[in-house]
Design a protein with these regions (language model features):
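Short glycine/proline- and charge-enriched loop/turn segments
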Residues: 309-317
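Metal-cofactor-binding active-site regions of metalloenzymes
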Residues: 2-290, 342-344, 348-360, 364-470
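C-terminal amphipathic alpha-helical interaction region
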Residues: 294-296
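Short, basic/hydrophobic alpha-helical segments
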Residues: 333-339
Length: 470
């Protein structure tokens, strides 16, 4: 019987173990998409206790706790103590078996704090006190944890109106880990609520110094901010969309739609889709001109529970996988850009695993050797799919229909400084997948050195470094 969470965790064969320990484990981390709070890195934030670093803002854990019958006050409440919240999490953990939370929890405790005990009500107090004491040491502050996990670069998620002051400070401090911004302009195309859109345009005008009265002014203001982001090291954009937008439109139509929504009038569904199409094309053109990589995270149905959304706001654990029909629109959108030679490097992340083969074949339509290997990427399993089963399905689809060897690999997509073991989890899963193929004679054992050096190390680190030019 294999042991849980030992040095060979998830590695079912000797070949998988060799690939992981000799190749994957030693590679630095490039976390090219995350939601860390930049201020925490700039200030080298010290976390008061284990709850502060582990439970705050973690909607994965909150969903599990709610499902386990835990009252909301122990998830997001303001009147419960940090220990009380942790105690309820510890009560929940034994019931998360076969959920990836069970693996992540114990990997994080082991790799960050050296804790090998299982977290449960009996061990909760000891583990909480031990980890909280360690968190007071400088090597467990925000920057210390990034050093501990050998993080070479992180890309945060930032709005075009953000000052990026914390990124600038980190750069000026000479911190070894590079913290780069990512351009996330979703609010600039969120025209569903005219008052909110107008308020955002006013912010954009203020920070860019461009007076906004017409659509062309919006693009000018965004160009100013795009160039500023580039000056601070930005190399990626990111777009959170339900589906791809690729409507036919004229410039006159977009000008009129902007005037309508900016004037406070509600748009029709057709007008909304046309405007979103135009904005995505403008964003894509900016990225192509700047040599950036654009990312598309699509397919989530957000804020399903209106009662809890009104109480807690977004990103609190009430989102789910959508079932949008996206193939034709995705194809049309990329072709709109490619036929004018304006298609930048692109990473596509689907949330519904139904779309794995769709995305894996779509990326093959728009590869271009002028950009190097793997111009268009099938992104790693995202959100509900960034677990063993989801990652294996994504990699199997990519292997079958594309080139796994040119994959840029894993990212945390996380708000937590304890989430870097997700890279280890991915690397173990990758090595197990490839190692099992070698053991079964599906790949030549004589090529194990090439596989380890070129493919495993490439996917874990080198492909991303070459792709993003960090």
């Amino acid at each position: 019987m294999k042991q849980f969470n030992d040095d060979n965790f998830l590695l079912q064969t000797e070949t998988a173990q060799r690939l992981y320990h000799d190749h994957a484990a030693k590679m630095p981390i490039i976390d090219y998409h995350c939601h860390l709070i930049p201020e925490y890195v700039a200030s080298d934030h010290r976390f008061d206790n284990l709850s502060k670093i582990w439970l705050e803002g973690d909607h994965y854990k909150w969903r599990a706790m709610r499902t386990n019958g835990v009252d909301e006050k122990y998830c997001t409440g303001k009147d419960t103590t940090d220990w009380e919240k942790f105690e309820k999490w510890a009560e929940t953990v034994p019931y998360t078996m076969r959920n990836p939370l069970y693996h992540w929890t114990h990997l994080e405790l082991k790799t960050a704090f050296g804790v090998t005990k299982l977290l449960n009500p009996a061990s909760a107090r000891e583990i909480y006190d031990h980890c909280t004491a360690l968190l007071q040491r400088p090597e467990y502050h925000a920057r210390g944890l990034m050093r501990r996990y050998n993080v070479e670069a992180v890309c945060t998620t930032d709005d075009p109106v953000d000052s990026l002051e914390h990124h600038i400070k980190v750069r000026e401090d000479g911190f070894a880990t590079r913290m780069l911004p990512t351009w996330r302009p979703d609010k600039a195309m969120a025209v569903e609520v005219p008052a909110d859109f107008r308020a955002y345009m006013e912010k954009l005008s203020e920070v860019s110094g461009v007076a906004i009265t017409k659509f062309a002014d919006v693009i000018d203001a965004l160009h100013v901010r795009h160039e500023f982001f580039g000056s601070v090291g930005c190399r990626l954009s990111d777009h959170g969309i339900e589906e791809f937008y690729a409507e036919d439109y004229t410039q006159a139509e977009i000008d009129a739609i902007f005037n309508k929504v900016y004037g406070g009038q509600t748009l029709t569904p057709e007008e909304i889709r046309k405007f979103k199409t135009a904005m995505l094309v403008e964003f894509a053109t900016m990225d192509h001109e700047a040599g950036w990589t654009q990312q598309f995270h699509y397919g989530a149905i957000r804020n399903n529970n209106s009662r809890m959304f009104g109480r807690l706001g977004p990103d609190t654990g009430f989102d789910s996988i959508g079932d949008f029909a996206v193939g034709r629109q995705m194809s049309k959108f990329f072709d709109m850009l490619d036929r004018n030679d304006r298609l930048a490097k692109t990473i596509i992340y689907n949330l519904n695993p139904r779309d794995n083969e769709l995305v894996a074949t779509m990326i093959g339509n728009f590869q271009d050797g002028r950009y190097g290997a793997g111009k268009i990427q099938f992104g790693s399993g995202w959100w509900f799919l960034d677990q063993k089963d989801g990652m294996e399905k994504q990699m199997n689809a990519l292997s079958t229909l594309g080139l796994l060897s040119r994959f840029v690999g894993m990212l945390t997509d996380s708000r937590s400084f304890l989430s870097y073991p997700r890279h280890e989890y991915f690397r173990r899963t990758l090595c197990n997948l490839v190692g099992n193929d070698i053991e079964q004679g599906l790949l030549p054992a004589s090529e194990i050195d090439f596989i380890g050096r070129e493919i495993i190390e490439g996917i874990c680190y080198r492909n991303a470094k070459d792709y993003f030019k960090f």
